[in-house]
Each structure stands twice: as structure tokens, then as C-alpha cells.
Amino acid sequence: MQTVSSYGVELRKQNIPVRQTLEIYRSAVSYLTEIYEQVWEELAEIPDAKRRFNAAEHLVHTTKKNPARFDFDLRFPKMPSYLRRAAIQHALGSVSSYEIRMELWEKSGKKAGKPRLAYENHAMPVFYRDVMYREEKEGKDEAYLKLYDGHDWKWFCVHLNHTDMEYLRKNWSGKRHQPRHWRKGTINISCVFLIRKK
């Protein structure tokens, strides 16, 4: 039997654009939340979650076959697609939760405790393996994160503690799951992995 666990790896203090990346991601989530609140009636008519997500993405992302209704791509140029999709999912979840809470509040007849949709958020970006996060060669205590430097999305090398990397190398079974990033006050990469059966 295999157990799924996670392990937080603290990054050493480094000169990488962590704050800029966090700020642009949270701005994107706030902008999308505002858009999806405006068009919620339209989105709520789509019962299938995957189809609703696709419709939400088509509203903000222009392709050859789809001109977007809103200017997300102009406001957040070159945002990696996986990060854009994570922001869309977060915003959809926030608006959906708000709408459900509002409906329940209205049915209750209470005057106090009216739900509020927060545009300022504490969303944390997800770094998907290979497109937003990749490891250095075996034996090196480094990884690469795709971060926003204020102008463009670039790969930045992050140095990890040797003991953390040894633990991860020992316990990762080869099937690595998506790493997440950031916690208030410190920077962490939490990598979910399957613990090898002894």
C-alpha cells in the first residue's frame, strides 16, 4: 500500500521575483472574479463543471477560433496557460461559493451576516511540473520556477537545502505530483509524493 504525503521545502533567501509573481497572479484572480460575477447567470446555466470552465476561459482568452469578450490577455500578457487556468479555477470557485452563500442567506431572511465577495484574495499560484516547475539534474540541490520579473515570464534557479533534497530523492517514487508555492512569511514548495512501501 502506498501513502500520499507532502513535504515542505523552504527556499533559501534568494534574489528571485517571488513578490512580482504573487502580485500578478493575485491581480489576475481578482480581475477574473470581477468578470465572473458579472456573467454568473450565464455561467451558472452550464451544469457540467468542465464545460463551465471552458466557457469561462473562452470569455477571457483569445485564440484563432475564439475572440475573447474581456481583455484578460491584454492586461496579463504572456501569462503561462497553466497559471491562467489555475487563476480561472480559483475565481470560478470564489464566485460560485459566494453565489451559493448569498442564496442561502436570502432564504434565511436574516439581515445580518450578508455574504461578501472578496476581490482582494490570498490566492497562491500552483506550479505545474515541467511547465512552471522543473528540477535540476540529479544530484544538484536546485530547481527552476517560472516567475514573472515585471516584464516577462522566465525560469529562475532556486537553491534548496541539501537535506531537503536528499529526503525528497529518497522518498519520491518517481511519480511526482504538482508542487505548490508560498506560505505567509516564508517560501515553501510542497511536493506531494507517494511514499515507497518498505
Predicted region positions:
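Nucleic-acid substrate recognition interfaces
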Residues: 1-198
